[in-house]
Amino acid sequence: MKVTLAVLLVLVSSGALAAPDEEALGKSRGYPVCANAQGSFSPEWCLVGVMSHYDSVYPSRVVKKPGTPRPLRRAAPEPALGLDRFLAEHRNTGLLVMRGDTILAERYQYERKAEHRFASMSMAKTVVAMLVGIALGEKKIASIDDPAAKYVPDLRGHPYGETPIRHLLTMTSGVKFEEVYNGHDDVMKLGRAILFQEGPGGAAAVLPYRERVAPPGQRWSYASSETFVLALVVRGATGESLSDYTTRMLWQPMGAESDAAWNIDPAGNEVGYCCFSATLRDWARLGLLLADGGARDGRPVIPADWVKAATSPQAPYPGYGYQTWVSMKQDRFHLRGLRGQAVWVHPATRTVVVHTGVYRIGGNTAAVAQDNFFDVILRAVGN
C-alpha cells in the first residue's frame, strides 16, 4: 500500500531534534581538525572536522567543476520524509534525498554546510570502477580480461599484476589482504604508507602483499588494495592522473556544481580506494547519473552496458558487482564507505539518497539503518 507523504509525517517525523553525541564529537571545541589526524581512526572529538576536510588534511589534487553545473530543482514545500527523526538517531553529517533532478530534502548536522566536501571512504571504489568503464569504452583499456600489469608494468611478476582486471573489479584476486578495521590490519598499513605519506607510493605500496590464497575469480574477499591497483591501471591506460581523467571524463560531463578532490600518495598517485571528497549535491548528481544508466539528459557519460554490469551481481558473493554493492532485492544498489558514507540508488524511480556520517566502526548497524530508511523513502515517494 502506498504511504502518502502526509501520513508519513505523522508516523515518523517529529520536528527538528538534536544531533546525537554532539559533545563527544567535538561541539564545544568547534568540531576541529586535530593534529596528526589518523583518517577515519581519528579521535571522536575531531572526526567531524577530519571527515569534512580530507582534501586539506592530506595531500590532494583538485577535480575541477565545469563552467555550468547540471541544474537541480528543489521541492517547494519540502515534503515530509522523516529526516529529522532519522538524524536524531544517527550520526549523519549530511543527508540528501533526491528524485530525478529534484532535491526533496537536504539536511546537515554538526555545523556542516552544503559547501563542505565530505570524504568518500570506500564510495570512491565505485568512482574508480566507473572510470575503468569509461576507459574501456574509449578502448584505452582493451579488455577487462587483461592482466593489470599490461597497464602497470611495475607489477609484472607480482600476483596483483597477474590478476585480470575483471577479478580486481569484483574483489576476487585471491591475494591475501586483511581488512577488518582494527587499526592494525593490512588496510591500515596501506593507508599509513600512501595516505599518511609514511611509505612508498604507486605500485611499490602493494608489493608486500604477495601471497595468493585462491585462484582469481574463485573467492570474494573485500580488499582496498585491489581498488588501488585499479586506479593505477586507469592512470597507466590513459596516461593521465586519475584526477585529470575524472575531471575530463566524469565530473565535468556529469555537471558537478563544485570542485572535488582526490587524495594522493607520496608518488602523486590517487588513493583510489578511499579518498575522494565531494559535496552532498554532487554525490547526488553522481547517483542520478548512475540511475540513468550513465547518461545525462540522454547523452552517455559512462557506457550504459558498463553501468548495468557494474551494478549487477558479478562476484561469488551475490551482493557485489564491480566495486559497487548490490541489494539482495536487486532493484537498487549503493556506494558504501566506512563510518556511514553511502549513496543509495533506485533506478526505477530515479531516487537517490546520500548519507555522510561519523558512525561508529563495527557491525552492520549503519547499512541496516540506511537500507530501512531507504525503504521508507521509496514508499513515501510512491515506489
What is the role of each PLM region?
Residues Q109-K113, R117, Y359-I361:
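A short acidic/small-residue loop/turn micro-motif
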Residues T102-R107, A149-K150, H184-P216, E240-D259:
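Short, charged, amphipathic alpha-helices and their helix-cap/turn boundaries
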Residues D101, A119-I144, L168, L230-V234, ...:
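Active-site SXXK
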Residues E257-A260, W306-V352:
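Active-site Gly/Thr loop motif
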Residues A16-K113, I141, T170, G174, ...:
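N-terminal leader/targeting segments and the immediately adjacent pre-domain N-terminus
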Residues A6-S14:
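Bacterial N-terminal signal peptides
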